[in-house]
A protein has these predicted regions:
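Acidic Gly/Asp/Thr-rich repetitive segments characteristic of extracellular carbohydrate-active
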Residues: 1-25, 30-39, 406
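Predominantly extracellular beta-rich ligand-binding scaffolds that present long acidic/polar faces
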Residues: 19, 32-51, 62-69, 130-134, ...
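Acidic glycine-/aspartate-rich tracts in secreted/extracellular proteins
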Residues: 27-30, 56-64, 82-83, 111, ...
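Beta-rich catalytic cores
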Residues: 92, 124, 162, 188, ...
Length: 422
């Protein structure tokens, strides 16, 4: 399948497509024949056009049987690999640009080898560019999807750099059970970049691994906007100055963020948030295995601020050492001697878990985390008056608190720190 033009994506077709599902058989599809990829927008339509794309169907069942679906066996891949060499490089295309009045959901799909060349300005991402204008909204929803091997070759330091998997110029993204892996940028977001105060990024049960981002957010760069993360693992990414970095607001709960000193230089989390952004951490494991570098760096003026709401295992130093920028909690456990925190690699499950004494670390409850989310996160410059409440509603919709990232039951009365329940 190839989309040769954008002729079918017009306001005239909005009414036909609104509310429809598109079922896609397993296979590899070159999604566009132009560097900018496929642009989807319906400017002037009265509402967001809602489209759902479901992958993973048996090709032999096409037009016959929707029951024959197995996304693992019948892998559905949208690619920009026009030169068919298996990597994102010159001659390849970006994948999707989402403009005004589109709300598109992909389920059970892989997005691979999207490429954005650094001398062009017709797209900012190898994978998805979310860029609604003043006359509409753009929403991307991904469920059980993979974004891999995308590359934004934007010049280091420029506004076009970064966000190789997803570049959020302006809009909303909701990622549930999504893997972002092996994407690359010269700087500012090897996997994701958020670039506007009106942009919102929700993440649940995601894995961000193997991405390369140069500097300033080698996994995620929050130049602006709002990040809400639950039950997610960020590890084995490479670069410097924060695997998560930026001045946008950050709500990070029940997540495991561990970077290896052999892969990175600089802090794991580099925060420049203003107090009005109300950024906070709760019930996470956050470690920097590079003992010479901080785990959390509060950068910028003295007005910047990040708060712990407790139950975090924090391994490594926090800088500046003496500061009002980072508010600690008596229910956290901090130690620059990382080994004493008893975080171990579980090779059978390929995850980091806490193996400490339960009597030495107070565990929190699901209700306490939910309450912190819904009542304590109302960042400024946000489309919602209470963004935490909106995030909480979405987490309930996707049943985010009943299981850990591997699908194992969570003990709601004694949650283990990080993304996994032992």
């Amino acid at each position: 399948m190839r989309t040769n033009t954008n002729s079918a994506i017009t306001t005239a077709n909005a009414k036909k497509l609104d509310g429809k599902n598109i079922y896609v058989a397993g296979g590899t599809y070159l999604i566009a024949d132009q560097e900018a990829g496929l642009k989807i927008e319906y400017s002037g339509y009265s509402k967001q056009v809602e489209i759902k794309v479901v992958g993973g169907y048996d090709p032999q069942s096409t037009r016959k049987d929707l029951s024959k679906r197995d996304p693992v066996r019948y892998l559905t891949t949208f690619t920009g690999d026009a030169n068919n060499n298996g990597i994102a490089d010159a001659g390849d295309y970006s994948l999707f640009t989402l403009g005004n009045q589109i709300d598109i959901t992909f389920e059970g799909c892989t997005f691979s080898c999207g490429y954005h060349p650094n001398e062009k300005i017709n797209g900012y991402s190898g994978g998805f560019l979310i860029a609604n204008g003043s006359s509409g909204n753009a929403t991307l929803q991904l469920n059980h999807c993979i974004i891999e091997k995308c590359y934004n070759a934007g010049v280091n330091g420029s506004g076009e750099a970064g966000g190789s998997g997803i570049f959020m110029y302006k809009g909303t993204a909701k990622l549930n059970h999504v893997q972002l892996r092996n994407n690359k940028a010269s700087s500012r977001g090897g996997a994701i970049r958020v670039n506007d105060s009106g942009s919102i990024l929700f993440m649940n049960n995601c894995s961000i691994t193997g991405n390369e981002g140069g500097q300033f957010g080698y996994a995620i760069q929050m130049s602006n906007g709002h990040l809400c993360m639950n039950n997610t693992t960020v590890t084995n990414n490479s670069g410097r100055d924060g695997t998560i970095n930026g001045a946008g607001s950050m709500l990070i709960v029940n997540s495991t963020i561990i970077e290896d000193g052999a892969q990175n230089s600089g802090a794991v989390i580099r925060c420049e948030s203003w107090p009005a952004r109300q950024s906070f951490l709760m019930n996470n494991i956050i470690l920097n295995k590079n003992a010479d570098k901080p785990v959390i760096e509060m950068s910028g003026s003295d007005e910047r601020h990040l708060t712990s709401k407790g139950y975090n295992l924090v391994g490594g130093t926090i800088i500046p050492v003496s500061t009002n920028k980072f508010t600690t909690s008596e229910f956290d456990k901090y130690n620059s001697m990382i080994s004493s925190l008893n975080v171990v690699w579980d090779a059978n499950r390929s995850v980091y878990t806490w193996d400490g004494n339960v009597n030495e670390f107070t565990r929190t409850t699901a209700d306490a985390v939910k309450n912190a989310i819904t009542t304590g996160f109302k960042p400024d410059s946000c489309p919602f008056q209470n963004l935490g409440e909106e995030f909480g509603k979405w987490l309930e919709e996707v049943d985010a608190f009943s299981t850990d990232q591997l699908g194992n039951p969570r003990d709601k009365n004694a949650m283990w720190p990080g993304a996994y329940q032992k």
